[in-house]
């Protein structure tokens, strides 16, 4: 999925990730920043960038992103998404379960709904691509895309 995501990102976009891939081998025009293993920092940086009217994509493991609820709520939802756009693309609700319990999450949908963050769960690559096009047209806000696994 991240390769599909790459083709939709523009030069003005930011892609933040938590040590998910080799940035040098990721073909995108976006400003790509590997924050490392620090999802709290990743969410705070995303909120700051979005607050300056930027479009920020976050790519990370769902379990690690969701468990940083305070940063997600305050930095991203309440601060950054008011003037910019934050799109969280997780690397699999259960797609990384083989790496341990911390890498999977099954309650991300109710958590996003509780936070009033728009939740999407595309099933196929085509649905994922159509969703990216749809979100590109939306105004400022925060959006969460749950992927079953990373198809790339």
What spans do the regions from the language model cover?
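Thiamine diphosphate
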Residues: 1-151
